[in-house]
Swiss-Prot record:
The modification 4-aspartylphosphate is found at D53. The keyword Cytoplasm applies. Gene3D superfamilies: 2.20.25.10, 2.40.50.40, 3.40.50.2300. The gene is ypdB. Its main location: cytoplasm. The keyword Signal does not apply. GO terms for cellular component: cytoplasm. CDD domains: REC_LytTR_AlgR-like. This is Transcriptional regulatory protein YpdB. SUPFAM superfamilies: CheY-like. Phosphorylated by YpdA. InterPro entries: CheY-like_superfamily (IPR011006), LytR-like (IPR046947), LytTR_DNA-bd_dom (IPR007492), Sig_transdc_resp-reg_receiver (IPR001789). Residues 140-245 form the HTH LytTR-type domain. Residues 2-116 form the Response regulatory domain.
Length: 245
């Protein structure tokens, strides 16, 4: 797995380089302190991941990531920065992670493990047919407290629309996503998630109990959570077919 580091502070660059070499099998093929130099390099070289600061000369990290997102081959991007206010932009660019300085070594080592696993999965996916069932290690990026949290998709219990935002719930956490529920639902595997209501989608694997409700609708009770998700009248027929009712 080939990676580059984009960081204009020499000591920070050296520290990150050491951590990558010490805790992963990744090959560092370049270190840069200037955004335009990175673009020139990527025109002739393919890498699998980029560790990217935001406050760098010539072209800041966010603009650099926007340019890279247009490439046919899109490397994983991990932002490592002191600027917490760009987390939502990083999410919109589908960054793999967003790490704030100063960081703990454990934060970097955990990210490296997940990144190598995601890259290995990507290599497998490129040579095998696309899976129709959610695998345990399939992940999605969720936003919490201006951080990007890489989350197993099957950890999601349900999502609820709030105006132009979507609240996403796992067993122990909640996340606020900067998108409407239709856009969020499009990122989920349809084999496991169902849009049961205009304001809700639910993980079918997390349903504990189905209770008939008014006007031939249903209320869904979920495993481990004290919450009821409605099924609207317009979705009842499709829901019955999915659940073989």
């Amino acid at each position: 797995m080939k990676v580059i580091i984009v960081e204009d502070e020499f000591l920070a660059q050296q520290e990150l380089s050491w951590l990558i070499k010490e805790h992963s099998q990744m090959e560092i093929v370049g270190t840069f302190d200037d955004g335009l130099d990175v673009l020139k390099f990527l025109q002739h070289n393919r890498v699998d991941a980029i560790f990217l600061d935001i406050n760098i000369p010539s072209l800041d990290g966010v603009l650099l990531a926007q340019n890279i997102s247009q490439f046919a081959h899109k490397p994983f991007i991990v932002f490592i920065t002191a600027w917490k206010e760009h987390a939502v932009e990083a999410f919109e660019l589908e960054a793999f992670d967003y790490i704030l300085k100063p960081y703990q070594e454990s934060r970097i080592t955990g990210m490296l493990q997940k990144l190598e696993a995601a890259w290995q999965q990507q290599q497998t996916s490129s040579t095998t047919p696309a899976a129709t069932v959610t695998r345990e290690n399939d992940t999605i990026n969720l936003v919490k407290d201006e951080r990007i949290i890489v989350t197993p998709i099957n950890d999601i219990y349900y999502a609820e629309a709030h105006e132009k935002m979507t609240f996403v719930y796992t067993r122990r956490e909640s996340y606020v996503m900067p998108m409407n529920i239709t856009e969020f639902f499009s990122k989920l595997p349809p084999s496991h998630f169902f849009r049961c209501h205009r304001s809700f989608c639910v993980n079918l694997n997390k349903i504990r109990e189905i209770e008939p409700w008014f006007n031939n609708t249903y209320i869904l009770r979920l495993k481990d959570l004290d919450f009821e998700v409605p099924v609207s009248r317009s979705k009842v027929k499709e829901f019955r077919q999915l659940m073989h009712l």
